[in-house]
């Protein structure tokens, strides 16, 4: 008897957690977009744990830091993720002054 009651309570608790989750998704479209972007970045392997999630993406805060004599601007939130992605891209190879292509 107690096992069935415990299973029933656990099932009710799981149902309530699911309802709370879906309720928060439906009432907060910004959180849906944020979770979508986080999922995409995570799938691409570009999510960084050093960048804290922003509470409002409309006004990102800027913090200036000095690293070995150079000034950098660190942004928080969505724009910081985009700039981090852009910074991680490899540089294009330098132009070669070698032999030009051949015309047939």
Swiss-Prot record:
One Pfam family, short name: Pep1_7
Site (Required for ligand-receptor interaction): 98
One GO biological process term: innate immune response
Annotated transmembrane regions: none
Statement: the UniProt record of this protein carries the keyword Ribosomal protein: no
Function, in words: Elicitor of plant defense.
InterPro entries: PEP
Name of this protein: Elicitor peptide 6
Taxonomic superkingdom: Eukaryota
Skewed-composition ranges (Low complexity): 48-61
Residue span(s) of the pro-peptide: 1-81
Statement: the UniProt record of this protein carries the keyword DNA repair: no
Region (Disordered): 48-104
Skewed-composition ranges (Acidic residues): 63-74
Naturally occurring in which organism (per UniProt): Arabidopsis thaliana (Mouse-ear cress)
Similarity-based family: Belongs to the brassicaceae elicitor peptide family.
Keyword terms of this UniProt record: Plant defense
